[in-house]
Amino acid sequence: MLSNVKLTAANVPHKDSLTTEEKATLWKNISSVLIETGRPGIKRLLNWMQSDCGNGVMNYVNAPASTKYHGNYPGGLMEHSWNVYVWLTIIVGNANSMKDADAQLKNEESKAMMDSAAIVALLHDICKVGFYSMEPKNRKTYDAEKVKNALQKDVKHDSLGDFIWETVMSYTVTDTHKFGHGEASVAIIEKFLGVLGLTTEERM
């Protein structure tokens, strides 16, 4: 799909944050792959994915993949979606190469299959656009240096040791969807690609 990116397991990053440059590269790769599908309306969808959502909620480029589990940092949604795409592309390619020569997909069939992989993988969580925002929350910290420098009246103790309460910015969910993530993602995609923009298999 993307001629200047070799899709191997090595393309799947394992980290807990992304630099501005890494986010920009991810967005460039994702945009290029989706544009190559040639689906009508895909450029309008991409414009929406990176646009300002307003009300403090995050777009596709800046959203995390979750509030406190996988990809819980800015750009985590992009990274998670790209990782799914890389692995799905590898699986599809390997499955085709294992077939007998006569049974292998022709070029146009292979292109259609890879296009579907791109749509399904990169957009499966698109319902999380406008889904996350940040708000201050109180949490315990057991950081020895912070506890040492705190006022004595602020130091508490529990089974894990001495701690203080601190206010940190944390992700919170603003869920306006009336049904599950899969159905919500399909509904969003079809707003831009039309009701014929997805195959039956992609809707599943």
Task: Locate the predicted segments by residue.
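Residue-level signal for alpha-helical context at structural boundaries
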Residues: 48, 102-103
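Solvent-exposed, flexible loop/coil residues
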Residues: 64, 81-82
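Non-catalytic interface/linker regions that flank or bridge core catalytic/transmembrane domains
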Residues: 1-63, 67
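Divalent metal-dependent catalytic cores for phosphoryl transfer on phosphate-bearing substrates
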Residues: 68-73, 79, 86, 93, ...
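A residue-identity detector for tryptophan
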Residues: 27, 48-49, 82, 87, ...
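Generic N-terminal helix/loop capping motif
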Residues: 33, 48, 52, 87, ...
